[in-house]
């Protein structure tokens, strides 16, 4: 969250609501019944953590309202009724979801005006393009969204319920097989950190597995909060490989490369060339080292041989949706 015209968000925190697992015994400690974002993260050892947004769609409106309240009053420290707001939503978001969002903004927070933008379109704005296909992969959901001259092509948008949280789960499973136990919602956050710090995408998965078997070059160690050190090897690339091979976790879905290709093939034959040449990655789950090269390799294999393929991975892609929103909301034409 932040202000239009800024080049980076003022507040970045996870959409988590944490509730105490135990009853408070110290009088006057001012214990709350719910903690939001970073505070929930830091006190996670005694909390049950819940995500009100599942697969990119809000599933718990009371918690979502708490998160918005926290954003306005504690993070940005502005009165919501004094500013117009730009909110974002996942592509193919149910209409009822958008209506509920609008209702809460107007009735609970009394905002003077608001606009709901599609996340992937904003990412494309942030990359300085008006035509391209965006692969947006966050925590709960991935989408491929073809956009031509600023218009999203709804018939060709594809959704894949495979994203950051599934990769964290997958890594939790692999680590459990290795004898490390991560069970609570709080411990899952530790695994997420391991994933963000150490995981990468292999250019050639089979070859990388061979390398990992024969040498210790891929091994890295990670210190857990209690001081115990774990070593992870092939897990580093086995976990993000799920993006390209969902069958590894028993999902009957096409990988992100195939989904991108299928999305392009659903578009008019005349615009495919422009889409192949502007494949833009966005969202936290596209932050793995090596993902752009692998994506380029996989799509080149699927596309016609003469086709020029370009995968763009902007360094700020973790926040490119926000940056695109900042650009859009600061346009005078938009404000009218």
Curated annotation (Swiss-Prot):
Pfam families, A to Z: Actin (PF00022)
Keywords: ATP-binding, Cytoplasm, Cytoskeleton, Hydrolase, Nucleotide-binding
InterPro entries given in the database record: Actin (IPR004000), Actin/actin-like_CS (IPR020902), Actin_CS (IPR004001), ATPase_NBD (IPR043129)
Keyword ATP-binding tagged: yes
Subcellular location: Cytoplasm, Cytoskeleton
Catalyzed reactions per annotation: ATP + H2O = ADP + phosphate + H(+)
EC number: 3.6.4.-
Lineage: superkingdom: Eukaryota
A GO term, aspect molecular function: ATP binding
EC top class, as a word: hydrolase
UniProt main location, coarse: cytoplasm
Signal peptide boundaries: none
Coiled coil (UniProt feature): none
Record-level GO cellular component terms: actin cytoskeleton; cytoplasm
Keyword Transcription found: no
Family in the record: Belongs to the actin family.
Further facts: There are at least 7 different actin genes in tobacco.
Function of the protein: Actins are highly conserved proteins that are involved in various types of cell motility and are ubiquitously expressed in all eukaryotic cells. Essential component of cell cytoskeleton; plays an important role in cytoplasmic streaming, cell shape determination, cell division, organelle movement and extension growth.
Name by which UniProt lists this protein: Actin-66
Organism, as annotated: Nicotiana tabacum (Common tobacco)
């Amino acid at each position: 969250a932040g202000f239009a015209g800024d080049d980076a968000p003022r507040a970045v925190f996870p959409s988590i609501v944490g509730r105490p697992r135990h009853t408070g015994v110290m009088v006057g400690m001012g214990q709350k019944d719910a903690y939001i974002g970073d505070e929930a993260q830091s006190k996670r050892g005694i909390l049950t953590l819940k995500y009100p947004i599942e697969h990119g769609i809000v599933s718990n409106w009371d918690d979502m309202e708490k998160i918005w309240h926290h954003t306005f009053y504690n993070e940005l420290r502005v009165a919501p009724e004094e500013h117009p707001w730009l909110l974002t939503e996942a592509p193919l978001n149910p209409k009822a979801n958008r209506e509920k969002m609008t209702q809460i903004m107007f009735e609970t927070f009394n905002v003077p005006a608001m606009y709901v933008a599609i996340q992937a379109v904003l990412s494309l704005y942030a990359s300085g393009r008006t035509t391209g296909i965006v692969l947006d992969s966050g925590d709960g959901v991935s989408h491929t969204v073809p956009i031509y001259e600023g218009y999203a092509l709804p018939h060709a948008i594809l959704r894949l319920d495979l994203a950051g949280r599934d990769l964290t789960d997958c890594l939790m499973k692999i680590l459990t097989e290795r004898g490390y136990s991560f069970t609570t919602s709080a411990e899952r956050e530790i695994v997420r950190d391991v994933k963000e710090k150490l995981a990468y995408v292999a250019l050639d998965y089979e070859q990388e597995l061979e390398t990992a078997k024969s040498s210790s070059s891929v091994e890295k160690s990670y210190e857990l909060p209690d001081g115990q050190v774990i070593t992870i090897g092939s897990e580093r690339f086995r976990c993000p490989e799920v993006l390209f091979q969902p069958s590894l976790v028993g999902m009957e879905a096409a990988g992100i490369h195939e989904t991108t290709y299928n999305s392009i093939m659903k578009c008019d034959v005349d615009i495919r060339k422009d889409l192949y040449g502007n494949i833009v990655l966005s969202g936290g789950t596209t932050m793995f080292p090596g993902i752009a090269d692998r994506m380029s390799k996989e799509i080149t294999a699927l596309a016609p041989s003469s086709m020029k393929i370009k995968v763009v991975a902007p360094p700020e892609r973790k926040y490119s949706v926000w940056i695109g929103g900042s650009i859009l909301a600061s346009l005078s034409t938009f404000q009218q």
